[in-house]
Amino acid sequence: MQTNSSLSEATGSACDPLTRAQILIEALPYIQQYQGRVIVIKYGGAAMVHQERRAEVLRDIVFLACVGIRPVLVHGGGPEINSWLQKLDIPFKFVDGLRVTDAATMEVVEMVLVGKVNKQIVQLISLAGGSAVGLCGRDGNLIKARSQGRAEIGFVGEVSSINPQLLQTLLEGGQIPVISSVAADETGQAYNINADTVAGELAASLGAEKLILLTDTPGILKDPQDRSSLITLLDIETARQLIQAGVVKGGMIPKVQCCIRALAQGVRAAHILDGGSPHSLLLELLTDAGVGTKLVPSQFSAQLEGLNNGSR
């Protein structure tokens, strides 16, 4: 099976057989802990843009499914949308990090995310030996949207409600749901919703073990210019303090807020990590040290994580 290469690649080709065996043993308790649990993964950034990384990340997701973990994949597709808007000579701009989405732009967004990017991901999962079903919020009334109420950004929406039953049925059948962040309101009007937001709300609705945001940075950094200043573990209150202090800023703010909201609704842990780093998903989930930032609900949870030998 093609997924056999995922963990061996993550361990490094130069490792001797004994070292590889030790790494597999290190992964075992995590595999046992997460078996049968839902993990919602937001897939975007460099992990989607670069062909090699894209195939690698999806192969790692198939690996997780093969060992009994239940991944749900939510994807963006900003660069692909930009490319098609340029091809169609449709100007685009952003306000507060949100794509201004008029009727023409919304049509392209839905075409690209639902009809192109989503199906490409499903196909790549199939090629990696997995079985996936592509969906958007419209399908099976999975996600209902509503307007954000800001005329200047057009058809940019937020999640109104979620019907998790469809996803639960797919997961029980061994499928990997692949979800694009397009949904409609009660009148059928389509909305473009931030994929991080969709992932967080789905994680809460499904009672997920984890929410994972694959980004273009290693996680939350004390110094954005220093990748070695990674904060590996923090709780909701500390995360809020970092936002107020300006340590968390720019595009990282909505990602951290998304994690905070998911944790407040019962998700056990949220992770922010670099999706462009080789096998970061496996290393974050299945090793003691991890490679990104882990957020937990409370200081007590953080202390407990520390006592558990840095458990991810």
UniProtKB/Swiss-Prot annotation:
Which keywords accompany this UniProt record? Amino-acid biosynthesis, Arginine biosynthesis, ATP-binding, Cytoplasm, Kinase, Nucleotide-binding, Transferase
- Reaction catalysed by this enzyme: N-acetyl-L-glutamate + ATP = N-acetyl-L-glutamyl 5-phosphate + ADP
Q: Name one GO molecular function term.
A: ATP binding
Look up keyword Nucleotide-binding and say if it applies.
yes
> Which InterPro entries does the protein's record reference?
AceGlu_kinase-like_sf (IPR036393), AcgluKinase_fam (IPR004662), ArgB (IPR037528), Asp/Glu/Uridylate_kinase (IPR001048), Glu/AcGlu_kinase (IPR001057), NAGK-C (IPR041727)
List the Gene3D superfamilies.
Acetylglutamate kinase-like
Pathway participation: Amino-acid biosynthesis; L-arginine biosynthesis; N(2)-acetyl-L-ornithine from L-glutamate: step 2/4
Which residues of this UniProt protein bind substrate?
Answer: 77-78, 99, 192
Q: What is this protein called?
A: Acetylglutamate kinase
**EC number of the protein:** 2.7.2.8
Its lineage reads: Bacteria, Bacillati, Cyanobacteriota, Cyanophyceae, Synechococcales
The Swiss-Prot or TrEMBL record describes its family as follows: Belongs to the acetylglutamate kinase family. ArgB subfamily.
Q: Where in the cell is it found?
A: Cytoplasm
Functional description taken from the UniProt entry: Catalyzes the ATP-dependent phosphorylation of N-acetyl-L-glutamate.
Site (Transition state stabilizer): residue numbering on this chain = 42, 255
GO annotation (BP), single = arginine biosynthetic process via ornithine
* A single cellular component GO annotation: cytoplasm
